[in-house]
Regions:
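Basic/polar N-terminal segments that are highly enriched at the extreme N-terminus
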Residues: 1-7
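Preference for short coil/turn "hinge" residues that link or interrupt alpha-helices
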Residues: 4, 12-13, 39, 134, ...
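Extended, charge-enriched "interface" segments that sit outside catalytic cores
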Residues: 7-10, 15-125, 129
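Glycine-rich phosphate-binding loops that contact phosphosugars or nucleotide phosphates
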Residues: 116-248
Length: 248
């Protein structure tokens, strides 16, 4: 398909100063506003030919219809025959997204509400000072990125930690500085069978049980998963399991 996509013109040889001098309206013209986003492109080394070429290339590559197919819940993940609807997680409560006869928005907000209520309880529980996310891949990188980006807004009592490496030194180093009584673990695994994640989770569980006893697991572990049976078997209260869907 890409062989049929038109080429993009070469970057202009003019400097930014020359581009602004040649086009006094550049600062106003090269701005895109979408919802709450304002994207300023005027200081990028582009000109009208580049913009037109990029738009044509996107058109040739069927970007718009493929985007619309994704938003509509079509199964564009052809490898696993699944929809790709991470966008549904950001839809407002009053939106509607019906896929194969089911409106996904109420389901999404049911989980978001449960997450919000749980987060409020943790903020109010002065016993908890440290939260350890145990995951790998997207179950580690995504939460770690969000925590880093929003660090200035976190609760001053709560500290976040991330464990993903199956090398035992990673989890051991993290646990060495923590108090079992004030630590909460989040085990993030869709199937609750990911080897790396479960290995680290079992290490953390043993560390907690050794200090506080078996009953403490239900109070100090929560799960992000779709497998209630395995989550319960680990000792986590399924009321503290936050689910998601194959299309995420």
């Amino acid at each position: 398909m890409l062989a049929n996509v038109g080429a993009v013109p070469s970057l202009p040889t003019a400097t930014l100063a020359e581009l602004f001098a040649a086009d006094p309206s550049r600062a106003e013209r090269y701005v895109i506003e979408v919802a709450d986003l304002r994207i300023v492109l005027s200081r990028q080394p582009i000109d009208d030919d580049i913009v037109a070429g990029l738009v044509q290339r996107a058109t040739d590559a069927l970007v718009a219809p493929r985007r619309d197919a994704m938003f509509a819940g079509e199964r564009i993940n052809v490898t696993e025959d699944r929809a790709v609807l991470h966008t549904a997680l950001r839809l407002p409560r009053d939106a509607e997204l019906v896929v194969e006869g089911t409106d996904l928005v109420p389901e999404v907000h049911e989980v978001l509400d449960a997450m919000g209520a749980f987060a409020d309880r943790i903020r109010a529980d002065e016993r908890i000072t440290d939260i350890v996310n145990i995951g790998i891949g997207g179950s580690d990188l995504g939460p770690a990125m969000a925590a880093q980006a929003l660090d200035a807004f976190r609760h001053p009592r709560l500290r976040g930690h991330f464990v993903s490496n199956i090398d035992g030194a990673d989890v051991a180093t993290t646990l060495a500085g923590l108090d079992p009584a004030s630590t909460l673990f989040i085990v993030a695994s869709k199937t609750f069978g990911t080897i790396e994640t479960l290995t680290n989770a079992r290490t953390a569980r043993a560390w907690l049980v050794d200090a506080l006893g078996e009953d403490a697991v239900a109070d100090h572990f929560v799960a992000v998963s779709t497998n209630a049976e395995r989550v319960s078997g680990f000792g986590i209260d399924t009321a503290n399991m936050f689910g998601f869907w194959d299309w995420v």
